[in-house]
């Protein structure tokens, strides 16, 4: 049950088919998005009251936005507000629906005769549609969007902004696709919208992502579809048909909270040869924390106490938690190779290189006997990232943070390039 939140609601700013947006008098720059108990299809050509849909939609959106925010995606979401609404930063909405597809189905097949249903896109295919109910939301090209010269909250939508939204759409889809896989659900396609935050002037994921926003097939089987397509496919809307649709929506709402957790545990154990390397190790631990990975620090020397080194190693091997060992040893690195030669777990050597003997010392981490498979990464942050990439193969939450980090790095470079180009004009 959501905690009751008292808000001072002002005027209605917008009303759509399935939601209303209100200003919040006590928090300038924030709005309330109120969902409706209404379901529509075909630009509201079909429209029905569906008791409980507002709460279902709000729960799904709140969980999905929380998942994306925690991954590092910039999202117009502050917190859930009761069962049927949430508070968000106020945005000026960009009137484009961004669609990302992994599997060809639905309208794509109608617009592209000859493509077989089930064709898979690698990478996912991104399309855009101008929000215009009177013209059935026509598909737009990138060139049309740029030529429109839209300006929202003072931000002109040009090539840079279009590229950012396109890349973000793909990243968001891939994160949600990966998140649904542990539930044995295939995310087939998805539509999202972006807005410009009126306070920060940044492009952010906005509006909602609920069961109207995607196609979701349990076990990859279209006949088991749980999304709004089950409503679109009704030849005639009957009370029984609506009840079936509601059960599908409830099925998704019951499982969406599971996306915020991972059944796959993970842990990084950093073994340092001396406490003089503690600062180097703390950087690794901090970087692991950015990926949500628990990290423990231990002190042991493979040269001076190999028996204790192997005992510590066995301690972590014995509790069943997937672990990556990171060895931090200066001068002659015996720690990483000894660990790697005596465990089936991944080992990363991250030696603290010094200016005087670093060029010579690093060879003890690089030139190793046969049968030793530890990698060497000099950057503390890089070693944590490599550990995250290992865990991300089976942990969707870690993978989501990695994917969002890639996107955010790309966006920062794109924005820096735009700023430099503007200075050169």
UniProtKB/Swiss-Prot annotation:
Residue positions where Phosphoserine is found in the record: 107, 274
Residue numbers bearing the N-acetylalanine modification: 2
PROSITE patterns attached to this UniProt entry: SAICAR_SYNTHETASE_1 (PS01057), SAICAR_SYNTHETASE_2 (PS01058)
Binding site for CO2: 332
InterPro entries named in the record: PurE_classII, PurE_dom, SAICAR_synt/ADE2_N, SAICAR_synthetase, SAICAR_synthetase_CS
Region (SAICAR synthetase domain): 2-260
Phosphothreonine: residues bearing it: 238
Catalytic activity: 5-amino-1-(5-phospho-D-ribosyl)imidazole-4-carboxylate + L-aspartate + ATP = (2S)-2-[5-amino-1-(5-phospho-beta-D-ribosyl)imidazole-4-carboxamido]succinate + ADP + phosphate + 2 H(+); 5-amino-1-(5-phospho-D-ribosyl)imidazole-4-carboxylate + H(+) = 5-amino-1-(5-phospho-beta-D-ribosyl)imidazole + CO2
Region of interest (Linker), ranges: 261-266
Entry GO terms, CC: cytoplasm
Keyword annotations from UniProtKB, A to Z: Acetylation, ATP-binding, Decarboxylase, Ligase, Lyase, Multifunctional enzyme, Nucleotide-binding, Phosphoprotein, Purine biosynthesis
Modified residues (N6-acetyllysine): 36, 247
Pfam families named in the record: AIRC (PF00731), SAICAR_synt (PF01259)
Any one Gene Ontology molecular-function term assigned to this protein's record: ATP binding
Pathway: Purine metabolism; IMP biosynthesis via de novo pathway; 5-amino-1-(5-phospho-D-ribosyl)imidazole-4-carboxamide from 5-amino-1-(5-phospho-D-ribosyl)imidazole-4-carboxylate: step 1/2; Purine metabolism; IMP biosynthesis via de novo pathway; 5-amino-1-(5-phospho-D-ribosyl)imidazole-4-carboxylate from 5-amino-1-(5-phospho-D-ribosyl)imidazole (carboxylase route): step 1/1
SUPFAM superfamilies: N5-CAIR mutase (phosphoribosylaminoimidazole carboxylase, PurE), SAICAR synthase-like
Keyword Transcription regulation appears in the UniProt entry: no
A Gene Ontology biological process term: purine nucleobase biosynthetic process
AIR carboxylase domain: region residues: 267-425
Modification Phosphotyrosine occurs at: 22
Listed EC numbers: 4.1.1.21, 6.3.2.6
Subunit text: Homooctamer.
Task of the protein: Bifunctional phosphoribosylaminoimidazole carboxylase and phosphoribosylaminoimidazole succinocarboxamide synthetase catalyzing two reactions of the de novo purine biosynthetic pathway.
Assigned protein family: In the N-terminal section; belongs to the SAICAR synthetase family.
Protein known as: Bifunctional phosphoribosylaminoimidazole carboxylase/phosphoribosylaminoimidazole succinocarboxamide synthetase
Organism: Mus musculus
């Amino acid at each position: 049950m959501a905690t009751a939140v008292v808000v001072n609601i002002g005027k209605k700013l917008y009303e759509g088919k399935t939601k209303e947006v209100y200003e919040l008098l006590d928090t300038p720059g924030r709005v309330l998005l109120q969902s409706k108990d209404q379901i529509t299809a075909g630009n509201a050509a079909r429209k029905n009251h569906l008791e409980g849909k507002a709460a279902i939609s709000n729960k799904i959106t709140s969980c999905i936005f929380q998942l994306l925010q925690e991954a590092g995606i910039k999202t117009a979401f502050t917190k859930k507000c009761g069962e049927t609404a949430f508070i968000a930063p106020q945005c000026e909405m960009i009137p484009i629906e961004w669609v990302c597809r992994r599997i060809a189905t639905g309208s794509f097949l109608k617009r592209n005769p000859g493509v077989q249903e089930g064709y898979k896109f690698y990478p996912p295919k991104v399309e855009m549609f101008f929000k215009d109910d009177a013209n059935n939301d026509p598909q737009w090209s990138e060139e049309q969007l740029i030529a429109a010269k839209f300006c929202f909250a003072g931000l002109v939508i040009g090539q840079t902004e279009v590229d950012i939204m396109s890349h973000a759409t793909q990243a968001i889809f891939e994160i949600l696709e990966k998140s649904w896989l542990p539930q044995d659900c295939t995310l087939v396609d998805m539509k999202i919208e972006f807005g410009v935050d009126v306070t920060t002037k940044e492009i952010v994921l906005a509006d909602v992502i609920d069961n109207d926003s995607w196609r979701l097939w349990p076990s990859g089987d279209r006949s088991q579809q749980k999304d709004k397509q089950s409503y679109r496919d009704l030849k005639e809307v009957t009370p029984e048909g609506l009840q079936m649709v509601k059960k599908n929506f409830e099925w998704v709402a019951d499982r969406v909270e599971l996306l915020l957790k991972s059944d796959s545990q993970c842990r990084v154990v950093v073994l340092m040869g001396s406490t003089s390397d503690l600062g180097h190790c703390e950087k690794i631990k901090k970087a692991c924390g950015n990926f949500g990975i628990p990290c423990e620090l231990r002190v042991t020397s493979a040269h001076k106490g190999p028996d204790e080194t192997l005992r510590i190693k066995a301690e972590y091997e014995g509790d069943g938690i997937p672990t990556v060992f990171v060895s931090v040893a200066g001068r002659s690195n015996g720690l990483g190779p000894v660990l790697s030669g005596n465990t089936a777990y991944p080992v990363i050597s991250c030696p603290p290189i010094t200016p005087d003997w670093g060029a010579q010392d690093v060879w003890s981490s690089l030139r190793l006997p046969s049968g030793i498979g530890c990698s060497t990464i000099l950057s503390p942050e890089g070693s944590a990232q490599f550990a995250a990439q290992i865990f991300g193969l089976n942990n969707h939450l870690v993978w989501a943070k990695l994917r969002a980090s890639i996107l955010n790095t790309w966006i920062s470079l794109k924005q820096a390039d735009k700023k430099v180009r503007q200075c050169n004009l």
